[in-house]
Amino acid sequence: MLEFNATLLAQIVDFIILLIFLRLVAYKPLMKLLSERSEHIERNIAAAEKERQQAEQLRASYEAEMRRAREQAQEIIQKATKAGEEQALQIIENAKNETVRMKETALAEIEREKQKAMAELRDQVVTLSILVAGKIINRSMSSEIQHEIVRDFIKEAGELPC
């Protein structure tokens, strides 16, 4: 069986004293240190979570701001495009109006030149008619008959399409 001797008993007593001493000196401070370390880690995790939430809120805020900025930019582009199209239509309308005005001016100028040419032509025809008639008649007709013949000729010449 087991023998109890004094050294075994002394070793058991020494072991118990060592356990009490280690509990007082090492175990409690070690547990306190581990507890503090655990609390510190939990605080860091909570702080990191809080910062992550703040970062998420900032990201959402920035995304909303970017969306608003894109919408405003799109609106500005649409307004500028519409203004450009309206300006182009106005320029085209002005060009059409100017073309019509220039055409009317040109037609009026052509008509004036035509009337002027007709008047000059009539004057030349009258002069030539008088000369031709004078030579044909050889001064045998009276000037009254000559004028009547010329008037008839001018009247007939005025009815000609020129």
From Swiss-Prot:
It is found in: Cell membrane. GO terms for cellular component: plasma membrane; proton-transporting ATP synthase complex. It holds the Pfam family ATP-synt_B. Belongs to the ATPase B chain family. CDD domains: ATP-synt_Fo_b (cd06503). F(1)F(0) ATP synthase produces ATP from ADP in the presence of a proton or sodium gradient. F-type ATPases consist of two structural domains, F(1) containing the extramembraneous catalytic core and F(0) containing the membrane proton channel, linked together by a central stalk and a peripheral stalk. During catalysis, ATP synthesis in the catalytic domain of F(1) is coupled via a rotary mechanism of the central stalk subunits to proton translocation. Component of the F(0) channel, it forms part of the peripheral stalk, linking F(1) to F(0). GO terms for molecular function: proton-transporting ATP synthase activity, rotational mechanism; proton-transporting ATPase activity, rotational mechanism. F-type ATPases have 2 components, F(1) - the catalytic core - and F(0) - the membrane proton channel. F(1) has five subunits: alpha(3), beta(3), gamma(1), delta(1), epsilon(1). F(0) has three main subunits: a(1), b(2) and c(10-14). The alpha and beta chains form an alternating ring which encloses part of the gamma chain. F(1) is attached to F(0) by a central stalk formed by the gamma and epsilon chains, while a peripheral stalk is formed by the delta and b chains. It is a single-pass membrane protein. Gene3D superfamilies: 6.10.250.1580. Keywords: ATP synthesis, Cell membrane, CF(0), Hydrogen ion transport, Ion transport, Membrane, Transmembrane, Transmembrane helix, Transport. Disulfide bonds: none annotated. SUPFAM superfamilies: F1F0 ATP synthase subunit B, membrane domain. The keyword Membrane applies. The chain crosses the membrane at residues 2-22. This is ATP synthase subunit b. The gene is atpF.
